[in-house]
Amino acid sequence: MMITLFTLAVVSIGFFLWWLLTVQPAVTKRALKHIPELRFEDNDTPERYTQDSRSLLFRGYDKYLRHGIPFQMRHPIEELGPQVLLPMKYLDEVKYASTSLFSFPLFSEKVFLLNYSNAPRQTDAAAHVVRVDLTKNLGALANGMYQEAIEGLNQSLSASEEWNTLPAYDFLSSLTAQVTALALVGPELCRNREWIDISLQTTFAIFNAAFTIRSQYSPRWRWLARWQSDAPKRMRAMRARAVELLAPVYQDRLAAIKEHDFGAFADCLHWSLRGNGGETSLTRIAEQQLFLTVASMHTTSSTLTAVLFDLLIRPEYCAEITKEMQEALTECEGKWTLQEVAKMRKLDSFMKESQRVHPIGFITAQRMTVRPHTFKDGLHLPAGVIFQFPADAVHHDPAIYPRPDQFAGYRFLHLRETVDANRYHFASVSDTMLGFGAGSHACPGRFFTSLAIKLILVVLLTQYEVKLADCDGSRPANGFNDFNMGPSREATIMIRKRSGL
């Protein structure tokens, strides 16, 4: 009898914890009644928040945030409740706060239903290997990444000087996957088509799984999705295949570590194992690699595509920056170091201005409150609230950036020359440049992203002629979804080898 009662108690407690973590209702408007709400004046539907949230954010910034007042707005995913936009005065309290108070992983779980989809998760180990090992070794990786960009273009394009017409985003995503995979998993897999396909598909699989599960199961019954829904099954299959592809590479890295040959390989897989004394399992390594792919792949390729579009419609900038690249190439004799990359200051400034005008997201520092919190000035947020800061609106504030709607490719070069030579570079973060987040939780891979984009652009612009296909001189229109923006997925480019090369 005692065993039965004990078992029943354990099951009951377990069910309550499951309910608390997965079925607990989202925070209500009533709990946020002290925060003003902003809505669309007409057609205030969830779809409108998916398609037109930028205009509402700008309205909210001018009406509330600029004056230090937070506001709430509808979340396009109704079950998540209202979301809060905070003014910048709260950023310092948030950006250094512990994840036990304000959590991005919890936000990701609630939005993408990671508990049900078998998707790879963020881990401290993965963030550490990028922040420390990868960043520290970028100089050693630079030339290999440059050569990989050359190889990737040679594989994709005809050797003749005929024009190749290609879908810009898909082409650049595949090239980015190959170049970045060299640093993530090493030379054995960076040219493996199946690994590249997994790299490209994982992010979309996560989005699709969340959408499918949310549409098929109410919160109370989502635990069934792991066994019934095809979406988690597809994710499991991708993870299993990733493990199979990584297995021989994993064994090679493990053998090198056991022989104390710590310099044998320069990639994140090796550094992850070395940091744990070779005791990290293959399954866990695969989890880390898939997460790093999700974190870096489409953000890097989207930014690269946006920068290229901005260059191609501004031939005066394109010519000057290509000349700067050629001078750097001559000086380094085709063997890149970080010092030589850093000399391309016009390119760096142009990339940062492109990111300011055409970001991949309108907001930054997305978090969910793990427990109730009262800020220093008395603002209270209950547990379970999604909140964020208005990056895009800050980047278009004329009090911060004069003539913010004008694309000034050398805006940040001028600031480096007149204000501070050590600030305003592409990978830097500040309270007025939020493209990579803020504080201790800023994107740990931003220096890697910067290097990859620059080296790919060097190969594209110095060895090839590139132009937009069917272009009337205007930039291909961006796509919008919720708080996200990205370069056109339909736009095509024309590319051919420069004569004499």
Swiss-Prot record:
- Return the InterPro entries for the record: Cyt_P450 (IPR001128), Cyt_P450_CS (IPR017972), Cyt_P450_E_grp-IV (IPR002403), Cyt_P450_sf (IPR036396)
Residue ranges of the TM segments: none
- Recorded metabolic or biological pathway in which this protein acts: Mycotoxin biosynthesis
Give cofactor(s), names only. heme
Region forming the signal peptide: 1-28
UniProt-recorded Gene Ontology molecular function terms? heme binding; iron ion binding; monooxygenase activity; oxidoreductase activity, acting on paired donors, with incorporation or reduction of molecular oxygen
Q: Which residues are glycosylated?
A: N115, N154
Q: Which GO terms describe its biological process?
A: biosynthetic process; secondary metabolic process
Which EC number(s) does UniProt give? Answer: 1.-.-.-
- Function comment: Cytochrome P450 monooxygenase; part of the gene cluster that mediates the biosynthesis of a family of the mycotoxins cytochalasins E and K. The hybrid PKS-NRPS synthetase ccsA and the enoyl reductase ccsC are responsible for fusion of phenylalanine with an octaketide backbone and subsequent release of the stable tetramic acid precursor. The polyketide synthase module (PKS) of the PKS-NRPS ccsA is responsible for the synthesis of the octaketide backbone. The downstream nonribosomal peptide synthetase (NRPS) amidates the carboxyl end of the octaketide with a phenylalanine.
Q: Please give the name of this protein.
A: Cytochrome P450 monooxygenase ccsG
Provide the gene name from the record.
ccsG
